[in-house]
């Protein structure tokens, strides 16, 4: 299981700064696609090839509201789902009454808690940490979220217990499909339609949380695992802040899966929550199929409106196949596995270095890179750097100055010429290094003696 790390603490201790610092450590896709929505309260991150999900639970103790009440409403869902809790405090302000109340509330959860003393740059770390010893938390880390100090060692320690578990999870040969979508969009109904039996209980109870359900499934001699992520069933009266964290189970399933099937509701169109889920799937680099459910019975005018909205709002996900289905009646469901298999095989496909290099040369010849300070950016060669998603590593000169628009051009051209369907493509750029950079020219002994003779001769001549 992909670990979930929750950030908790009173306001202004640096949770959002730490969240941004950690989520930026991942190698993002080629660029920030226009229109791509990223929810800033939960994110996918990676540290030294170890993936995890991080959740910012927000500030606790605002306006003197009782801490236990806030913990039970805003943060309890996220903290209960978390494998590790990072309790942030301010090393400059020292221990406060709210910090003590939060520590007391965290003890009741029986979770692994790390105390993270932030803002220790420029001050004595030992003295800053000593002020918080009375909280009784044994694992204490001094960091600077704004400057990045201490974060790498913090992540190494908290992720260490999950390394074996993460490696074991990659050994399964079955294709894992995560059914992602908002509550009541029809995920369980679709899985039941695929299985041909009522394997998943379909119900709607406000505030009810269910774990993800993994169901082994064989179709045409291929093995699959269908992952249903029911999450929290919400009604309008449920606190909106709680609803924010109802997707944590879905995020874990997305990280575990090979292919994500994002289910949309044709009656409601594309919502902000749909866009957040889609953004997380793309940032995770997973193969993607989009299914628009409840398509039957809609008037033609409404269908055209939905298609127009899909084209306008999902243009950055144009690599994904879109299929219009009815999970209840079965129309369009049969073609989903064709799209899923196509996306999976694109995601794991291999390409030789000569093929990628020739393609890079053809693409750059068609539209040459720009000149920087009178020198043209050179793209020398390309090779495959990974799978699911496919990673292409491009080597050259002055690649740091390559415009984002040209990176998008390369991305689109590679997807088109390689015939990739249903998977994002990740491109990494590595600049050529001068082997003589930062190296001082060392004279031989003969050259040193000659230099001394010349200096003596010049001195005597004066």
From Swiss-Prot:
GTPase that plays an essential role in the late steps of ribosome biogenesis. Residues 3-166, 175-348 form the EngA-type G domain. GO terms for biological process: ribosome biogenesis. GTP 2 binds at residues 181-188, 228-232, 293-296. Gene3D superfamilies: 3.30.300.20, P-loop containing nucleotide triphosphate hydrolases. The lineage of its organism: Bacteria, Pseudomonadati, Pseudomonadota, Gammaproteobacteria, Legionellales. Belongs to the TRAFAC class TrmE-Era-EngA-EngB-Septin-like GTPase superfamily. EngA (Der) GTPase family. This is GTPase Der. GO terms for molecular function: GTP binding; ribosome binding. InterPro entries: G_ENGA (IPR031166), GTP-bd (IPR006073), GTPase_Der (IPR016484), KH_dom-like (IPR032859), KH_dom-like_a/b (IPR015946), P-loop_NTPase (IPR027417), Small_GTP-bd (IPR005225). Associates with the 50S ribosomal subunit. HAMAP family: GTPase_Der. Residues 349-433 form the KH-like domain. The keyword Nucleotide-binding applies. Keywords: GTP-binding, Nucleotide-binding, Repeat, Ribosome biogenesis. CDD domains: EngA1, EngA2. The keyword Repeat applies. It comes from the Bacteria. GTP 1 binds at residues 9-16, 56-60, 118-121.
